[in-house]
């Protein structure tokens, strides 16, 4: 059994099927990268996993607990969200809080740590990211890459079972893509389980242990990263990868 297992996850909206009977297993320590065209349902899948959007039906097994998406209690939702931290594409930092406060406040108010405990955790993470000198700056004083890295630090500080990343490099220049790649690889070395949505093949190949192709709400293929990129099994995957490589060339 994986750390996370999703069975028959379906999401409909106004009569349209956005995600169709998805089955997915993520093992502890894996970095699953989900790729696909714009509108394929990648971000919706992340939001459904974190319950920012409620799936219409399906089941989730997280650790030793299994949940029916159609019968979640308020306690179930809190438990799931505590284990699945999400790093948003637009960073989602509080502009009226410093970089340090953006990391510490979820620890103080969400996990009931003391201010001293939260600050120690945040300062350690900022030091690892070589962002100690940015601790007292506000998001508007930080570059996009720095904001993204603060978002990553905030997610790591919560010590979730899994960190979800929504297009973490989509608005960054190539040099910063390399920095974010190294940050994610560092998390992987620590044993952190991650699910990453991206449309950038080079980035996906750098960080993935497993890769999945989502197309029009259907999970077409899931395979180890080396196999996925060198010997994809499904014709749809082959066509997508060839088109994406041509576009990036």
Where are the regions a protein language model picked out?
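Helix N-cap at the start of a conserved alpha-helix in ABC-type nucleotide-binding domains
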Residues: 174-176
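ABC ATPase NBD coupling module
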Residues: 67-85, 115, 231-232
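Conserved ABC ATPase signature
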Residues: 138-142, 146
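A short, proline-enriched helix->beta-strand linker immediately N-terminal to the Walker B motif
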Residues: 157-161
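Catalytic Walker B motif of ABC-type/P-loop ATPase nucleotide-binding domains
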Residues: 163-166
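Helix-to-loop junction immediately C-terminal to a conserved catalytic motif
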Residues: 50
């Amino acid at each position: 059994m994986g750390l996370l297992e999703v069975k028959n996850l379906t999401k409909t909206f106004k009569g349209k099927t956005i995600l169709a009977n998805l089955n997915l297993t993520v093992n502890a320590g894996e970095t699953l990268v989900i790729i696909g065209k714009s509108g394929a349902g990648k971000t919706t899948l992340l939001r459904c996993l974190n319950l920012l959007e409620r799936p219409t039906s399906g089941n989730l097994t997280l650790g030793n607990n299994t949940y029916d998406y159609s019968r979640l209690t308020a306690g179930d939702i809190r438990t799931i969200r505590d284990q699945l931290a999400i790093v948003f594409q637009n960073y989602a930092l509080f502009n009226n809080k410093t970089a340090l406060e953006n990391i510490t406040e979820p620890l103080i108010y969400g996990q009931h740590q003391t201010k001293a405990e939260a600050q120690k955790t945040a300062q350690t993470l900022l030091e690892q990211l070589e962002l100690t000198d940015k601790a007292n700056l506000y998001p508007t004083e930080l570059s996009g890459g720095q904001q993204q890295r603060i978002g990553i630090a905030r997610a790591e500080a919560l010590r979730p079972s899994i960190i979800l990343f929504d297009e973490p490099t989509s608005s960054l220049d190539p040099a910063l893509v390399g920095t974010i790649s190294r940050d994610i690889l560092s998390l992987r070395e620590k044993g952190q389980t991650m699910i990453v949505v991206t449309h950038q093949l080079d980035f996906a190949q750098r960080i993935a242990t497993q890769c999945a192709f989502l197309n029009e709400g259907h999970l077409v293929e899931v395979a180890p990263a080396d196999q996925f990129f060198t010997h994809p099994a499904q014709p749809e995957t082959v066509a997508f990868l060839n088109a994406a490589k041509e576009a990036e060339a």
